[in-house]
């Protein structure tokens, strides 16, 4: 049987350290999601307004965030702001800022798409029934939009969790960084440990994201 180096995880507190690193990744994701969801909803609603200047500004922001790789944004926020403005940002704070910028852009586009997908005749019918604009949104538009958005926003959460693997590049000790440290510390005693440890990291990410993906799929089928 091939030596996968899994015994390294049983030494000392290596497995506990890996789980702690996963906790850091999940914490960054959770904070970023909690901030970016309401901001994304607000910007998504604003993107449906007919003000050309506002739409242009928001579109430029959306395209900039989409085109720019997350790793470049991490370097720009973490290293660039430190040099340019003298800010003392921790790696985790810089990561949250970047993921909030990214998550807000993605969520705003989802909200915009969900709102413009509502047929115009529903607005017209509600107006014909004597409903105010606020009543139209509260009783007709928002319930439909929420049903469209929840599965998509849950998928955004899984994408954010997986993308946190990039934050090791700015020194955040998350699960992948811990895995590298364990491999380096045991390179001589267990030269084959890399495969087993990275396999464990894969399983941890899978266990973190799989239930969320199942929930998104279930809701999408239920509300289709």
Residue locations for each model-derived region?
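Transmembrane alpha-helices and adjacent helix-loop boundaries
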Residues: 1-224
């Amino acid at each position: 049987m091939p030596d996968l180096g899994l015994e390294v995880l049983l030494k000392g507190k290596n497995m506990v350290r890996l789980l702690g690193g996963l906790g850091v990744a999940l914490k960054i994701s959770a904070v970023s999601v909690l901030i970016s969801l309401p901001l994304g909803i607000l910007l998504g609603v604003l993107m449906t307004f007919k003000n050309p200047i506002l739409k242009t500004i928001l579109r430029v922001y959306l395209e900039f965030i989409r085109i720019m790789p997350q790793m470049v944004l991490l370097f720009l926020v973490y290293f660039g702001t430190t040099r340019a403005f003298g800010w003392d940002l921790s790696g985790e704070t810089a990561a949250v800022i970047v993921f909030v910028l990214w998550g807000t852009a993605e969520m705003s586009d989802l909200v915009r798409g969900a709102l413009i997908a509502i047929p115009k005749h529903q607005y017209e019918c509600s107006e014909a029934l004597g409903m105010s604009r606020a009543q139209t949104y509260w009783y007709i538009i928002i319930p439909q939009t929420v049903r469209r958005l929840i599965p998509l926003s849950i998928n955004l959460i899984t994408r954010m969790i997986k993308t946190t693997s990039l934050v090791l590049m700015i020194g955040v000790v998350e699960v992948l960084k811990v895995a590298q440290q364990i491999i380096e510390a045991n390179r001589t005693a267990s030269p084959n440990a890399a495969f087993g440890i990275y396999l464990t990291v894969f399983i941890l990410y899978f266990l973190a994201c799989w239930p969320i993906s199942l929930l998104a799929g279930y809701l999408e089928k239920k509300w289709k």
